[in-house]
Amino acid sequence: MRQIAFYGKGGIGKSTTSQNTLAAMANRHGQRIMIVGCDPKADSTRLILNAKAQTTVLHVAAERGAVEDVELDEVLKPGFGGIKCVESGGPEPGVGCAGRGIITAINFLEEEGAYTDLDFVSYDVLGDVVCGGFAMPIRENKAQEIYIVCSGEMMAMYAANNIARGVLKYAHAGGVRLGGLICNSRKVDRETELIENLAARLNTQMIHFVPRDNVVQRAEIRRMTVEQYAPEDNQAQEYDQLAQKIINNEKLTIPTPLEMDELEELLIEFGLLGDEEDRQKQIAAQDAAIKATAAK
């Protein structure tokens, strides 16, 4: 059994990318998969279950009074392609630590024997947060392969670099490795070249470039993956290619995160960030505009 995790900046399309890819892995390649959603939004399994947010382990545990009183079939639901789906959940906003929900859920699943008869367990983890709780799949050596969903946008690349730092921190203590960057395209100029360059500097690969296509949104509105909604579409073939690459991936590395100066140099090189001279010109132009407005 292989345990993988998808990380990435909030809003990058991580849950969408992971569910579409896992659907292809299960439906086309017969992989037995369990998804463990590690995001308090509980949206990591929606497209697989064709449903609204799934009832979470923490929610049921709160109703029962203790996680020991939860039955496995209350929180583990089968979905498209026979994929088993679980959402860890989290506390009310502003109260407690959502990371504890992940720890509680994983321990519960292990004790209930949910990890048997599987080829893959996939953890879908909140945004770019690599604090203790959200890093739990990495820290406790649960997830052995980390896939970072990113794009050619500046903040997505910052997040990818930060996540690589988190992987590096635990790589020597455990067996966690970086499996690659998945570029979920935002149609940025020279995006493929940029992410390939970033991947090389991080000592990894751009495992796949997922083009932008409106069929993904059309499927999402129906709470489906593209694999279920339009299996003959070109986009379904893209997710299938990514699925095959993950199944066959042997390039698992210890990342070499960039220093901030190095990352900024890369962004400047590709025109995503101006150099110091450009920055000073921007500031001067803004100051002039403010003064002109004030003088009216």
From Swiss-Prot:
GO biological process, one term: nitrogen fixation
Pfam families registered for this protein in UniProt: Fer4_NifH
Cofactor, free-text remark: Binds 1 [4Fe-4S] cluster per dimer.
PROSITE patterns in the record: NIFH_FRXC_1, NIFH_FRXC_2, NIFH_FRXC_3
GO molecular function, one term: metal ion binding
Top-rank lineage group of the source organism: Bacteria
Keyword 4Fe-4S: yes
EC code: 1.18.6.1
PTM comment: The reversible ADP-ribosylation of Arg-100 inactivates the nitrogenase reductase and regulates nitrogenase activity.
NCBIfam families the UniProt entry points to: nifH (TIGR01287)
Cofactor(s) for this UniProt protein: [4Fe-4S] cluster
List of residues binding ATP: 8-15
Function of the protein: The key enzymatic reactions in nitrogen fixation are catalyzed by the nitrogenase complex, which has 2 components: the iron protein and the molybdenum-iron protein.
Enzyme kind, highest EC tier: oxidoreductase
Native source organism of the sequence: Trichodesmium erythraeum (strain IMS101)
Protein name: Nitrogenase iron protein
Segments traversing the membrane: none
